[in-house]
């Protein structure tokens, strides 16, 4: 039985004939085939990375919304300001320069902000 690998553009190759393949499957949907070499398309990998940030930040933003409402009820404008800043950081997370400037998959993985988003899914 032959196993085929299909890249992001729908090109397929017999897995036994591949000469180089990415070390992990984190960005599997960014794989691109050139001859017998499979590499990762950085533009597609960045999109996947940003989508993962959006997925992770959603519950974090929802939690901040709850805290903000409590601060509003308490009339705590200092806490409201702190929470608003945190929410802005979360909203801006997919647009950081570390992601934009990443030239390699390793640099892209290193762009995960563990202080803001928690443990990296790429560790």
Labelled PLM ranges:
Residues 1-123:
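A preference for well-ordered globular domain cores
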């Amino acid at each position: 039985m032959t196993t085929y690998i299909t890249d992001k553009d729908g090109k397929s190759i017999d897995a036994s004939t591949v000469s180089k393949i990415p070390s992990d499957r984190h960005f599997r949907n960014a794989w691109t085939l050139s001859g017998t070499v499979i590499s990762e398309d950085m533009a597609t990998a960045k999109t996947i990375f940003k989508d993962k940030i959006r997925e992770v930040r959603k519950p974090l933003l929802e939690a901040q919304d709850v805290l903000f409402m409590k601060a509003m009820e308490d009339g705590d404008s200092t806490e409201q300001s702190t929470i608003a800043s945190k929410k802005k950081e979360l909203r801006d997370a997919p647009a950081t320069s570390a992601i934009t400037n990443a030239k390699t998959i390793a640099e892209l993985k290193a762009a995960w902000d563990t202080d803001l988003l928690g443990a990296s899914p790429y560790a």
